[in-house]
């Protein structure tokens, strides 16, 4: 289905997965006896074990059969990688950005002021990522912050390990 993999990350030696097989037998019937889906109700698919599952789980199972490993995280992995890569920029001591040491993010994040106040630091960090690929930055920040499980937006320390994050970042390029 269109958009089924929009938030799913797949990786296998930098290769692109083959399209999913279009077999009608893989779809679970909707709960409705008419065969129609109810408005607002998610479609259900038949998973590898025969039980109903979400379209995301179905896709991950199909790609796993091709040797790929994947994650469905609704953008959580990308957000986590962004925060690790831009940590030093996000947490610069900009006046007014932090009122308490318990904030998950600077108060000006998502505003024009955020970029204006950090323009040089942002450009420098992006150039560093272009030059090195950023894996070293992810490693450094993760190794420093993970032991304390620093409370920061997008950081899901218990959900994604450093090796997993590095592998995904490398696959994304």
Task: Say what each PLM segment does.
Residues 5-173:
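Nuclease catalytic cores
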